[in-house]
């Protein structure tokens, strides 16, 4: 299988609140992420191109609600989500988090 990702992806296990509205009422887990998107392990489904919202705690910025778009749905497994319209500050914070996980995974 040819890898189509534009950004390095890291494995993780991060509890997360997400949902179809900014209230982010669902509680699941992110199992991998990059500055471009993430995989949410969940039994909830959502069709591709559905807008979702993900509540993150980024660096010293506190809580952020990030908007994403479902790219694929693995039934009863999870959702591949692409982040949409990240601010430059959010991109930098995600890159710092990716670098942290990359460093930890190579040790």
Where are these regions (language model features)?
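N-terminal helix initiation/capping motif
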Residues: 1-33, 95, 99-107
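Short, charged beta-turn/beta-strand-edge "cap" motif at the junction between a beta-strand
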Residues: 57-61
């Amino acid at each position: 299988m040819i890898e189509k990702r534009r950004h390095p992806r890291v494995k993780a296990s991060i509890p997360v609140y997400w949902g179809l509205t900014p209230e982010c009422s669902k509680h699941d887990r992110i199992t991998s992420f990059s500055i471009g998107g993430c995989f949410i392990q969940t039994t909830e489904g959502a069709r591709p191109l559905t807008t979702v919202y993900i509540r993150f705690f980024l660096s010293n910025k506190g809580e952020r609600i990030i908007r994403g778009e479902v790219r694929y749905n693995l039934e009863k497994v999870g959702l591949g989500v692409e982040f949409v319209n990240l601010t430059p500050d959010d991109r930098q914070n995600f890159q710092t988090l990716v670098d942290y996980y990359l460093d930890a995974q190579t040790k």
